[in-house]
């Protein structure tokens, strides 16, 4: 029976990871649909590259930084060389007792690594959307190396690796803070250095609309993300081969779906009330906001409570997008609002839905946001001192497809 349970839980972890991996396609389609047509090929290239970089960097160093043998603030040096051997040995196919599990899971270490690495790529995908339309590719990929290999794993250890947040009772089931707030804080740091797209703001500071190139493509991206989120949240139960875990996974799936639905409806109703029209881009961000909001605790609430959590997320993302835009934060896809601002709400909502400690949750969001923002800001400033991270006005005029890639996504449309 133990072998059957091990096999089923391992299979479940791998399949959940595959669903989360498919979210990379969702982010790609969402971003490609919400940017201008002259930047679409660059978006596709960027997402292919960042996913691959995340996988390699997490294998080389991120995994052992996030799950070291001990310490309270991350395995910066402790056990580094032995951990490299363990990490690079993931492909050996040896059983767990011969490889050595980092924290005693009941499925293979290879499955654990795969499930973890797609979360890393998700965090970096959040940055991709926020900097769309004006960041050069090489600096972006250099930043991806540092975020996925070092910044994300260090703060990830604080919670999931047994670090100080875990020890003080911080609760974040699937990563509203650890993944989404981390990605959004990094995105905010990069955007702060990068500045807005050319023509986004008038000389008087007025906001100029820059509509996306393909709304159906963006909507497809949201549907893919919605589907992938069942693996993101459901897989975080880490087991399915017992009656209790099967019921828990079912509840997580239910709540994930209901929260996204609540976010969509809230954003649609609010946009109708505020503008007289239903804004489809706000509805898409409402879905993502609902998903992010419930990610910190998709298990404890009832289905009705999950709808409420998602709806609040939909309201928050609506006003946050407008507020940040007016403050000069140019975020073409609303990633900082949907993943960052709503991520904070999701973590703090666990105080009500899951009975978590208010102070532990507050310290968690502050620690993750500050560390990630400051570290990312420093890294971006260093990269910018070596090479310009921002495309010139002329390059933005012709589009990054031409200036960075050399292949236009829509050559027939001029």
Spans of model-derived segments:
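Hydrophobic alpha-helical transmembrane bundles of multi-pass membrane proteins
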Residues: 1-414
């Amino acid at each position: 029976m133990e072998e059957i349970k091990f096999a089923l839980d391992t299979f479940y972890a791998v399949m959940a990871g595959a669903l989360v991996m498919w979210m990379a396609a969702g982010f790609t389609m969402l971003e490609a649909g919400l940017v201008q047509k002259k930047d679409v090929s660059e978006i596709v290239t960027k997402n292919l590259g960042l996913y691959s970089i995340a996988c390699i960097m997490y294998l080389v160093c991120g995994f052992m930084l996030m799950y070291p043998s001990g310490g309270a603030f991350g395995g910066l040096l402790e056990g580094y060389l032995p951990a490299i051997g363990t990490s690079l040995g993931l492909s050996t196919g040896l059983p767990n007792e011969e490889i050595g599990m980092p924290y005693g899971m009941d499925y293979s270490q290879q499955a654990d690594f795969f499930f973890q690495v797609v979360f890393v790529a998700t965090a970096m995908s959040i940055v991709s959307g926020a900097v769309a339309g004006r960041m050069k590719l090489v600096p972006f990929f250099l930043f991806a190396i540092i975020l996925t290999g070092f910044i994300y794993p260090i703060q990830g250890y604080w919670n999931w690796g047994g670090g100080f947040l875990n020890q003080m009772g911080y609760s974040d089931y699937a990563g509203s803070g650890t993944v989404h707030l981390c990605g959004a804080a990094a995105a905010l740091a990069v955007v702060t250095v990068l500045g807005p797209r050319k023509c986004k703001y008038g000389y008087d500071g007025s906001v100029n609309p820059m509509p996306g190139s393909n709304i159906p493509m963006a909507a497809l991206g949201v549907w893919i993300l919605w589907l992938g989120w069942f693996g993101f949240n459901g897989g975080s139960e880490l087991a399915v081969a017992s009656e209790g875990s099967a019921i828990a996974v079912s509840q997580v799936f239910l709540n994930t779906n209901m929260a996204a639905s609540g976010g969509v409806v809230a954003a649609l109703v609010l946009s109708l009330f505020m503008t007289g029209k239903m804004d489809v881009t706000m509805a898409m961000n409402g879905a993502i906001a609902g998903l992010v909001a419930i990610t910190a605790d998709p298990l404890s609430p009832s289905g009705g409570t999950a709808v409420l959590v998602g709806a609040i997320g939909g309201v928050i993302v609506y006003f946050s997008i407008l507020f940040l835009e007016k403050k000069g934060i140019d975020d073409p896809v609303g990633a900082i609002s949907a993943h960052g601002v709503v991520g904070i709400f999701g973590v703090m909502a666990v105080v009500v839905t899951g009975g978590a400690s208010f102070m532990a949750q507050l310290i968690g969001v502050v620690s993750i946001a500050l560390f990630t923002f400051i570290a990312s800001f420093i890294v971006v400033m260093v990269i910018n001192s070596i090479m310009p991270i921002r495309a010139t006005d002329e390059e933005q005029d012709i589009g990054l497809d031409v200036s960075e890639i050399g292949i236009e996504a829509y050559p027939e449309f001029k």
